[in-house]
Amino acid sequence: MPTIQQLIRNKRQAAENKTKSPALQRSPQRRGVCTRVYTTTPKKPNSALRKVARVRLTSGFEVTAYIPGIGHNLQEHSVVLVRGGRVKDLPGVRYHIVRGTLDVVGVKDRRKGRSKYGVKRPK
């Protein structure tokens, strides 16, 4: 417990909030180029082949980003938009790729939750 004299000399330091997505550098999204597109397995107790991509961002960072939805058209050198948001069962994956922008197409035949997967309203 500091004395009043110590508090006059040095005021209390406010704890700084640490960002969960540092590679975005306080931007809502960042553009990047896929350097590798692959699948990986989630940690226990889940089992699947999750689609992820290694992306080199315009901020200079190279991050691993999750590709949401069923099916995708991504390959090496695809230009993508990356947003924050981790995948709980994939360690080290702290970003999501935005579907329906730049080189990524929206999810085919998606009817519900379309806005999250870049799908236009069906006729």
From Swiss-Prot:
PROSITE patterns: RIBOSOMAL_S12 (PS00055)
NCBIfam families linked to this entry: rpsL_bact
A UniProt-annotated Pfam family: Ribosom_S12_S23
Principal subcellular localisation of the protein: plastid
A biological process from GO: translation
Protein name: Small ribosomal subunit protein uS12c
Keywords of this entry: Chloroplast, Plastid, Ribonucleoprotein, Ribosomal protein, RNA-binding, rRNA-binding
Disordered as annotated region, ranges: 9-31
HAMAP family: Ribosomal_uS12_B
Function: With S4 and S5 plays an important role in translational accuracy. Located at the interface of the 30S and 50S subunits.
Disulphide-bonded residues: none
Subunit structure: Part of the 30S ribosomal subunit.
Alphabetized PANTHER family for the sequence: 30S RIBOSOMAL PROTEIN S12 FAMILY MEMBER
Gene name of the record: rps12
Any one GO molecular-function label of the UniProt entry: structural constituent of ribosome
Cellular component terms per the entry's GO annotation: chloroplast; small ribosomal subunit
Family statement: Belongs to the universal ribosomal protein uS12 family.
Localisation per UniProt entry: Plastid, Chloroplast
